[in-house]
Amino acid sequence: VWAWNTALAWVCGDVCVWKPSEKTPLCGIACQNIIAEVFKENNVPEGVSCLINGDYKVGEFMSKDSRIPLVSATGSTRMGKIVASEVAGRLGKSLLELGGNNAIIVSPDSDLKMTVIGSVFGAVGTAGQRCTSTRRLIIHETIYDKVKNALVEAYKQLKIGNPLDESNHVGPLIDTLAVDSYNNALNKVVEEGGKIIVEGGVLSGNGYESGCYVKPAIAEA
């Protein structure tokens, strides 16, 4: 998200200041180091791309600063409302990419193998923490059972563990707050009459000491 927004701005001759999520600062530093090398090789002034690490207070400061004509923000809907209000209050511009509820529609003539591969990767890749993570499947009734059974079998084969181990499919959630949200979501499914067809749960024991490794679950509504 940072790359495609800033690249357009740079091409148009603008300077960019980036504040990554306080939960993933190393990713921001790595990206900044890469672009710094590219700029140096092409004699672009160092300050054209700047990085500021910090918590939400840094974001608030940037939203209110009239020297920043356009603020691009990616995150939750709650965050987006705050940014939009602050930037609009100084007649600035905002570009928001906010949380959603992404779905895959599965029609009767869908390729079952590709459907399962795409759905599983979309749902469990990066432990379901991408803004583009698959959260729902809308399946035609004529193939519903076939797709459901295939997904259940696929989930049984998932390996959960250290993401630095390439044999694992699913890594940890970002922190214990995310684990709480995960548990609350599963509880809400049951409370609202849904059916859990692939059981979730927090993993414990050797390799799972952080308490942030969870089992991907599937709910039927």
Where are these regions (language model features)?
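Rossmann-like NAD(P) dinucleotide-binding subdomain of oxidoreductase/dehydrogenase enzymes
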Residues: V1-M114
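ALDH superfamily catalytic-core signature
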Residues: E37-V38, R78-A221
